[in-house]
């Protein structure tokens, strides 16, 4: 089983990815984790990426594509995983299609989490993240056991710069321009399932599991 999760920033893809990977017993492959791994190991691709990020620029598709392909090639033995954060545009999606074809892999479903801007702004305002392990919390919906402290490593939680209102709106604009066309791309391939991302975590999970079960029959 191979799943792709799509949705605007702040919709909760990472949370849902963790839940689904646990229930379905498949690997959760996060683009953010792959980048952090390359940064930590000082790989050539990681070093190149840092140069663009330091200038406030998007990492070029060819670098991101190669980074993802390298990771998947090493971890391909399971052939069961979900992708969170990739592809981000149609060119990356076409690259991924070619990679799957060459690797004899088959995409099961693309899950698109939809929500309005006002709802997303409200949700993003309460989001907090651990600077050490990257675990995401929400002060109302997914609070830590101790306010402001990560359950895993006891680090003080922070609000990412990306989650501050002015930065978030810029990210949303980029999403609408670059990533939203993927909805049409995968819809035309009859691989898209759209879900209301503002429902509870359990409700969203239930809907996704039901559509996956239907596809298996």
From Swiss-Prot:
Chief localisation class: cytoplasm
Function of the protein: Catalyzes the reversible transfer of the terminal phosphate group between ATP and AMP. Plays an important role in cellular energy homeostasis and in adenine nucleotide metabolism.
Domain comment as written in the entry: Consists of three domains, a large central CORE domain and two small peripheral domains, NMPbind and LID, which undergo movements during catalysis. The LID domain closes over the site of phosphoryl transfer upon ATP binding. Assembling and dissambling the active center during each catalytic cycle provides an effective means to prevent ATP hydrolysis. Some bacteria have evolved a zinc-coordinating structure that stabilizes the LID domain.
Pathway: Purine metabolism; AMP biosynthesis via salvage pathway; AMP from ADP: step 1/1
Localization per record: Cytoplasm
Family label: Belongs to the adenylate kinase family.
Positions in coiled-coil regions: none
Positions bound to Zn(2+): 130, 133, 150, 153
Full protein name: Adenylate kinase
Domain of life the protein comes from: Bacteria
Gene: adk
